[in-house]
Amino acid sequence: MQERHTEQDYRALLIADTPIIDVRAPIEFEQGAMPAAINLPLMNNDERAAVGTCYKQQGSDAALALGHKLVAGEIRQQRIDAWRAACLQNPQGILCCARGGQRSHIVQSWLHAAGIDYPLVEGGYKALRQTAIQATIELAQKPIVLIGGCTGSGKTLLVQQQPNGVDLEGLARHRGSAFGRTLQPQLSQASFENLLAAEMLKTDARQDLRLWVLEDESRMIGSNHLPECLRERMTQAAIAVVEDPFEIRLERLNEEYFLRMHHDFTHAYGDEQGWQEYCEYLHHGLSAIKRRLGLQRYNELAAQLDTALTTQLTTGSTDGHLAWLVPLLKEYYDPMYRYQLEKKAEKVVFRGEWAEVAEWVKAR
């Protein structure tokens, strides 16, 4: 049973979040995978390396024979059982290897012998990857409106609430600043790009999309970088700037970086370890900008952070964090953002408070 797919078929797979049983080795999967893929490899990393060496030294027939020798008996049966269970759990899914070659065909034939007929991606991960790249290039050509504003302006929430918005920071699992990490590890660059492409395809498919609403991001979001085709279009885009009162920004930052992050860490690790992780998270964020703050100012703010953490631990109040957060915003983040915005002042087409910008975007 062999499936042939056109470019539109590949896009449909991504739009539908079709479950993909990816039979490549874990090392390949970690380097790049599709969003709805699960990794159930035909060969583990060591087995794949051994077969690859054999192929180079003795040719394809010897490599194939070695592969069958390595994945035999109980190991083979365990893997068939895992694939069979995944197929039954995901009846609308599809098999995938690197290029739609021997590995996915072997798994498909073994499943057929076990009573399961399951399609495969002709062209494999490589074809899906090329589809993702091409889709991003094409979709990035649509007009873009960027949401700008100082830290704590609620830009991400505003983007999330737009039907034509794509939350780049959410996809990157990072909020873009020194304090931007989340509890989820960031994806590999290729996996991030694949996820972004799938999200853009789904957003475009849900509506007659005329323009994108994105947050005004730099090239890097944590360890991930935006695809060059999208980044180039963003440098030409119109910008709507959120200008909320300082006190409202502080409330948002308190909720996002202190209350929510403390909750998330304790939920993930338990009270004691979660508290330690939360403290390390805040100190790591401050330490990341030590050079720009200067050693003396950094030491002062770090001491105020320690005091605030002690107060939070003993009383539950996060108010003490204002002692270091306010000067950090006024002396570092706000001047830095204003400097960046000045360089693209001609792109700014609207300014207003959060609700005003949201209404303006909605009317586009």
UniProtKB/Swiss-Prot annotation:
EC number annotated for this UniProt entry: 2.9.1.3
A Gene Ontology biological process term: tRNA wobble uridine modification
Coiled coil: none
Superkingdom of the organism of origin: Bacteria
EC category: transferase
Stored PROSITE patterns: RHODANESE_3
Catalytic residues of the enzyme: C97 (s-selanylcysteine intermediate)
Catalytic activity: 5-methylaminomethyl-2-thiouridine(34) in tRNA + selenophosphate + (2E)-geranyl diphosphate + H2O + H(+) = 5-methylaminomethyl-2-selenouridine(34) in tRNA + (2E)-thiogeraniol + phosphate + diphosphate; 5-methylaminomethyl-2-thiouridine(34) in tRNA + (2E)-geranyl diphosphate = 5-methylaminomethyl-S-(2E)-geranyl-thiouridine(34) in tRNA + diphosphate; 5-methylaminomethyl-S-(2E)-geranyl-thiouridine(34) in tRNA + selenophosphate + H(+) = 5-methylaminomethyl-2-(Se-phospho)selenouridine(34) in tRNA + (2E)-thiogeraniol; 5-methylaminomethyl-2-(Se-phospho)selenouridine(34) in tRNA + H2O = 5-methylaminomethyl-2-selenouridine(34) in tRNA + phosphate
Family: Belongs to the SelU family.
PANTHER family according to UniProt: TRNA 2-SELENOURIDINE SYNTHASE
The protein's name in its UniProt record: tRNA 2-selenouridine synthase
Natural source organism: Shigella boydii serotype 18 (strain CDC 3083-94 / BS512)
